[in-house]
């Protein structure tokens, strides 16, 4: 699974970005990603505009036919955390609401912070864990060894890391995930009971790369 955070988004100074803004096009980053896209992969894309636009940006810079996706799927389950009424609001107003709440060193919110009419990061982690568990079951049943390129969001990728490494959500919020970066996981399905050489040590997910810049191969 190659998780790609979308391009930067259009936003107004002094305001929280809207929930579904357009992506800003960085030609150099899209070109670099186009060069390193795997062959014969399946692309899974969050339905928000910024991820769909990023996938299209990268597609324009693929180097050869084998890099074009075997299939594409829009997946609502990997959508970004919904900030509810905070999306598009003035930053000063949001900070005023957050002032009396518990603080986080590296995020404006704690995992348990409840955005008005929105979704807690802790709840997003549960949502992503459910999605990944479904993928784990499918991979084991189908013996699927295909590569999946996932065009998603910073908090989605943090939630993925939380699930794969059993990190508490507040710790996952401390992980930097940059625009156009790749975070790569391999999944090792458990073998049938009674016929397994695997141990519980290490879990079933291996991190191959974290927050890899688009400029690196």
What label would you give each PLM region?
Residues 1, 41, 142-155:
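Generic beta-sheet signal
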Residues 1-66:
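Active-site-proximal alpha-helix that buttresses catalytic centers in soluble enzyme cores
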Residues 7, 154, 213:
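Active-site metal-binding loops of divalent metal-dependent hydrolases
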Residues 17-20, 60-133:
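Phosphate-handling substructures
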Residues 30-35, 125, 129-140, 161:
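Generic structural signal for well-ordered alpha-helical scaffold segments
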Residues 39-77, 100-107, 186-217:
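Conserved histidine-centered catalytic loops in small-molecule metabolism enzymes
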Residues 45-46, 126, 151-152:
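Short beta-strand scaffold positions
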Residues 60, 81-93, 141-146, 162-217:
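Acidic, low-complexity terminal tails and accessory targeting/binding regions
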């Amino acid at each position: 699974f190659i998780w790609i955070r979308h391009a930067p988004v259009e936003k107004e100074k002094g305001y929280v970005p809207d929930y579904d803004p357009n992506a800003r096009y960085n030609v150099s980053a899209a070109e670099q990603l186009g060069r390193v896209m795997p062959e014969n992969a399946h692309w899974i894309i969050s339905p928000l505009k910024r991820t769909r636009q990023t996938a299209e940006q990268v597609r324009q810079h693929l180097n050869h036919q084998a890099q074009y996706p075997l299939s594409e799927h829009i997946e609502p389950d990997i959508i970004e955390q919904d900030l509810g009424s905070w999306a598009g609001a003035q930053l000063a107003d949001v900070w005023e609401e957050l002032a009396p709440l518990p603080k986080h060193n590296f995020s404006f919110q704690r995992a348990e912070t409840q955005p008005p009419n929105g979704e807690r990061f802790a709840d997003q982690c549960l949502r992503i864990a459910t999605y990944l568990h479904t993928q784990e079951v499918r991979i084991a049943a189908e013996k699927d060894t295909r590569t999946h390129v996932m065009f998603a969001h910073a908090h989605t990728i943090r939630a993925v890391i939380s699930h794969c490494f059993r990190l508490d959500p507040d710790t996952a919020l401390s992980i930097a995930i940059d625009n156009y970066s790749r975070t790569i996981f391999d999944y090792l399905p458990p073998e049938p009971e009674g016929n397994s050489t695997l141990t519980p040590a290490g879990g079933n997910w291996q991190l191959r790369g974290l927050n890899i810049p688009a400029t690196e191969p």
